[in-house]
Amino acid sequence: MAAASTVVVGAFFLPRPDAPATAVPTPTPAVLAPSETTHVLAGLRAPVEVRRDRWGVPHIYARSQHDLFFAQGYVAAQDRLFQMEMWRRQGEGRLAEVLGPAAVDRDRAARLFAYRGDMAREWAAYGPDTRTIVQAFVAGVNARIAAVGSDLPPEFGLLGFRPEPWTETVPLSRATGLSGTGNGTSEVLRAQLVTLLGAERTQAILPADPARALDPAPGLDLAGLTSASLGGFGSTFADVAYNRLEGSNNWVVSGRKTATGKPILANDPHRVITNPAVRYLTHLVAPGWNVIGAGEPAAPGVAIGHNDRIAFGLTVVGMDQQDVYVESLGACPAGAPGTLGCYRYRGAWRPIVTRVDTIRVKGAAPREVTLAFTVHGPIVSIDTARQRAVAIRSVHREPGTASYLASLALDRARTWPQFQAAMTRWLMPSENMIYADVDGNIGWVAGGIMPRRRWSGMLPVPGDGSHEWDGFVPGMQLPRAYNPAAGYIATANHNILPAGYRTPISYEWASRYRIVRVREVLDAPGTFTVADFERLQHDDRSKLAEALVPQVVAAAGRAGLGGREEVKLLAAWDFRMSRDQQAPTLFAALAPAIYRRAITRELQDHPEASRLVANRAEYGWLEKWLANESLSRAMRDTALVGALTDATADVTRRLGNDRAKWRWGDVHVAVFNHPLSSRYDLPAVSRGGDGNTVYATGGANYRQGSGASFREIIDLADWDRSMVTNVPGQSADPRSPHYKDLLELWGNDRYFPLVFSRARVEQETEQVLWLRPR
């Protein structure tokens, strides 16, 4: 029997058995014949035309802004109603109502981190008309819920519930963006290492970028802090790992580097690979609006794409937008309220603020949960033995930090100044937003709400008032570039701080290997086309392998092992993580094995510290360790050859001795299991690349866990030549022909045109839906 796995859809998790891996799936042809349908709806003010193209992308033509977003909500709910309902329940902390007791902890965390601030400031932060847009969008969703009747997507029947009407606050959820706000798990990890190794040695193992010494707060005892100290936050909203699985690539080149003489912009944001797709493509046309691209189906607007003047695409910056506070607890003064006691803040005892919520649970009695807060934010754990609590301060408490709502301002920007102004409203998650316009300009802005702090933010701090944020960095002071001399801009979650930039916004970044490869290609002579960037988005050359494999082969040769089959396999390899080769499979086990050998040797006097970091694969540190001249060659060779032995044994144990069965594409797969029923599972897809290639197909146990489910390449010489991909389909309804029709394209690294002009839209139209007012 296959081992149980966790399947992710949107943001809710359910146990499911593993699906068998197969080759690239057979193409699924579109089956909808051109047709015309009319839906009569209350709430519309004039007719709206929705043209779905043969890839399932809706092109919405409305006469007013209200009707445009009403229609967007209606159409999104046609395609993604169950996914949207589950996202809504995740944000409101109501999953247990339909999933049962397993979701109670997640619901508690969602309620703990809900926005509870001033609603007037909240709406104003996004822009003057955001509230009316959201109201129209929500009205459209509710119109679909009312219209669908009993013909709901099958998941509702499987779980036995109906979707509820939405309210205007549903798109204000912080749940999606909180995972990208900071470094809570690495703060606690550093605290553990400082306790074991001291600050200086911890800094050597987990170096800051830019360089900065660790700064433990005087008098704060870091002992006893563990991953459990983060409570539900650690597993629900905190960063997935120090080197996050969810990265992204984007680049934009000026016309002097393209065959057309106009810019080309490419973007592939990386998220967890799921069924249904995370992103939803749509085209919005009305007076003042003409924008196409991808967003999250539960929010109005487009977050990645282009209008008729500019194009834009994002990657995660990784700003440090949160801090872990250690609060000192004690008895409250006589007469002071505080059912959980008090905490020490600025020389006085303050009562812990509490709120009791009731979580309804399917198949079980309701659960009462107590939510506790200090001045810094939600309390995620209490250590009664040490009389302290851990609280999280995060920017989610600030107005305007709902994910992607700020894109409504971006969608209407037409110039570089307007683009920059729109990005000052983009607060959470922080993003590298690249830009191109039809006049030939290119640019980049780091957008996000960045706390000002007098300490590094790399360790937990005391909650006594000595470590408080001093406001936020003004948006126009964040890093940016415009028409650089290089003729291109590229980001890949790496350190993007310009030389001399005085406000470090993070000390933790993704590894450099993806951006090194992108720059290597973009710096080459010649000009580029859309097809060139299709290839670059799927580039599988491993710069990490280039750095490590020659050293392994040389060490094996010095040890007299050059004739071994695994050594010859690596020696002949071209460093491409190609599906049709065996060497990538060995390398996938080899690279982490080298790191484990090296870190175990480095921390041989502290096995507990070694255990904490053994699976982190800090390859930047590893390269420096291997280049350290103070280490003997014999010591380094022992680590390299030992790691090769470990990796060979690991792959052999998994796949057997027959090297023909080590083909990377046979074992490295993306899985599209349905979260509720194997009846709706899709075939596993063979993949090339890995997490350190531009292809970005990283994950554990050879499986692609995250990566680019959506890609765009925007041609500013001709919008209709822009290309896009999304997986597995535009619809989340297993009954729809657009449930899986994009899987074959994506699985074979192919795209479809993102048609924009009215003529091309009409040419590619598969179905026309008229929405008419009642």
Residue spans for each PLM region:
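Substrate-recognition/specificity elements adjacent to catalytic centers across diverse enzyme folds
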Residues: 14-18, 27-264, 269, 275, ...
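Charged, long alpha-helical assembly modules
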Residues: 589-670
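Gly/Pro-rich active-site capping loops and adjacent beta-alpha segments
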Residues: 67-100, 108, 313-370, 467-514, ...
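Terminal end segments
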Residues: 504, 508-564, 646-774
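Glycine- and hydrophobic-rich flexible loops that cap the catalytic core of alpha/beta enzyme folds
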Residues: 245, 284-310, 314-472
